[in-house]
């Protein structure tokens, strides 16, 4: 598992997705753990 905030940083974004609401963006400080595959998809990779 990789913090989505970290994955977002890789994608050049300083925001992370909410685990409970994948369609919304959460502040950078929100701790949200999902699989790196899911995070990568959300970043359009």
UniProtKB/Swiss-Prot annotation:
Protein name from the UniProt record: Pollen allergen Amb a 5
SUPFAM superfamilies for this protein: Amb V allergen
Disulfide bond annotation, renumbered to this chain: 4-39, 11-26, 18-32, 19-43
Source superkingdom: Eukaryota
Pfam families the UniProt entry points to: Ragweed_pollen (PF03913)
SUBUNIT field: Monomer.
Keywords: Allergen, Disulfide bond
Gene3D superfamilies: Amb V Allergen
Species, as recorded: Ambrosia artemisiifolia var. elatior
InterPro entries: Amb_V_allergen, Amb_V_allergen_sf
